[in-house]
């Protein structure tokens, strides 16, 4: 009798276990999930989770996920792996149940032409989505709705949509709060332009090339919390449409910014308040970013050692370039001096009031600076006159007269040569002052009085 009771209990328990291991529909009304903890044998299950009638599903785990890749590349593989016995039609991709999969590295990478609906997949246990849709062939056709995916356990999305040139679906509701790596996530995803401004990226440390060559992307991500990001190498490189305000970003932990805005030809937003004090590399940061023209003289660049090509082919306004030179040359008591022997490219930018600051950086720190040179061409070679003072005679032979108002008495002046060197300086002691310029060589010079623009005069 006891044996019979035990057998009955065993049969009931087995039946309950089998019944509990089935395919169900998630509360979101889209995702299909496997309630079991192991893959059944065989791994085909019949269920009615969608309420539309009985369907066949294939349950996969990490050991069989490669079959999905083969299926995506070649329909014949689908016949081999995803066709039930005595049938000829493989199970559709939307009926592959991925609840037991935790790693989806490169799942569709080799399948450049894949474009099947997989929005019902359960990815809630996946932690790695590296190169998920990435394709080196740049022929990715995938553009299906995957907005309902639960990616809350994913930590690595690097290269997920790399060169997924067709993808442009709404994924704004994704919970990416556990992601730490987004490097190259949308790099080369030339169609993508969805609003992902609400994403919580506070744990991300690597955003290298995240939107590089994402030529359509132009969404407001200025509210992103990037305070833990260390790597912004190539962040918007060649993101030719992007021009959104990101001046409020906390970039205080970033150490690399090379190529960040390289060829981002639309970008021209104020970022002068950024704390870049930990950045070491700014090479090509704004190279060919031809629209950019903002003051960044307040940046603390004392840790930067590489600035080659920083503004290559870019021309800041003279005012903004002067601001840069003057700001960077001015070291506050609590600031670290500039790194020595840095090679800096100011592109085609020209300086005027920043001449002495430029000369100071070169002489004090051994920097090599290339730019558009000294240019105060808005000033003519006749008598220079403003509301405050005038110069005469111009050209001058031995003396240069300055007539000014009381506001300029005891103010310092500098005379700068065409190479940006201060060759003479002093103070204006009277309303009408005379400067002896007899010892100066013939050429064009610039007189700068404190608080005023430089004024050009010719020494004959």
Where are these regions (language model features)?
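Alpha-helix initiation and N-capping motif
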Residues: 3, 354-355, 394
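Residue-level signal for beta-strand positions within conserved beta-sheet cores that form or flank
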Residues: 16, 41, 338-340, 365, ...
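Short small/polar-residue motifs
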Residues: 18, 27-29, 55, 324, ...
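Negatively charged
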Residues: 21-378
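C-terminal outer-membrane/trafficking sorting elements
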Residues: 384-460
């Amino acid at each position: 009798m006891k044996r019979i009771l035990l057998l009955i209990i065993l049969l009931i328990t087995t039946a309950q276990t089998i019944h509990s291991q089935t395919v169900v529909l998630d509360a979101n009304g889209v995702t299909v999930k496997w309630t079991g903890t192991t893959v059944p044998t065989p791994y085909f299950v019949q269920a009615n989770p969608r309420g539309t009638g009985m369907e066949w599903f294939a349950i996969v785990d990490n050991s069989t996920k490669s079959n999905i890749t083969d299926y995506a590349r070649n329909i014949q593989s689908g016949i081999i792996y995803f066709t039930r016995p005595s049938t000829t039609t493989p199970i559709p991709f939307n009926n592959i149940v991925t609840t037991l999969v935790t790693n989806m590295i490169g799942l569709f990478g080799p399948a450049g032409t894949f474009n099947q609906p997989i929005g019902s997949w359960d990815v809630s246990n996946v932690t790695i989505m590296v190169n998920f849709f990435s394709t080196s062939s740049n022929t990715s056709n995938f553009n299906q709705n995957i907005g309902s995916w639960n990616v809350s356990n994913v930590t690595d999305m690097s290269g997920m949509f790399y060169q997924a040139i067709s993808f442009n679906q709404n994924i704004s509701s994704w919970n990416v709060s556990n992601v730490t790596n987004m490097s190259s996530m949308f790099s080369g995803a030339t169609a993508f332009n969805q609003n992902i401004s609400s994403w919580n990226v506070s744990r991300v440390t690597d955003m290298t090339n995240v939107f590089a060559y994402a030529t359509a992307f132009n969404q407001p991500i200025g509210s992103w919390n990037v305070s833990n990001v260390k790597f912004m190498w190539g962040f918007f490189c060649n993101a030719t449409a992007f021009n959104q305000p990101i001046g409020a970003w906390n970039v205080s932990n970033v150490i690399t910014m090379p190529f960040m805005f390289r060829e981002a030809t639309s970008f021209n937003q104020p970022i002068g308040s950024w704390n870049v004090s930990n950045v070491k590399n700014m090479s090509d940061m704004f190279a060919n970013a031809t629209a950019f023209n903002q003051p960044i003289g307040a940046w603390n660049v004392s840790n930067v050692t590489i600035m080659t090509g920083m503004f290559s082919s870019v021309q800041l306004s003279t005012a903004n370039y002067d601001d840069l030179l003057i700001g960077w040359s001015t070291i506050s008591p609590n600031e670290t001096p500039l790194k020595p022997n840095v090679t800096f490219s100011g592109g085609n930018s020209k300086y005027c009031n920043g001449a002495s600051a430029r000369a100071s950086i070169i002489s004090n720190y051994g920097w090599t600076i290339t730019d558009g040179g000294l240019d105060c061409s808005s000033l003519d070679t006749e008598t220079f006159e403003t509301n405050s003072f005038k110069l005469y005679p111009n050209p001058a032979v031995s003396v240069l007269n300055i007539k000014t108002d009381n506001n300029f008495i005891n103010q310092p002046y500098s005379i700068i040569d065409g190479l940006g060197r201060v060759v003479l300086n002093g103070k204006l002691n009277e309303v009408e002052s005379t400067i002896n310029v007899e010892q100066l060589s013939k050429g064009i010079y610039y007189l700068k009085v404190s608080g005023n623009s430089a004024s050009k005069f010719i020494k004959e």
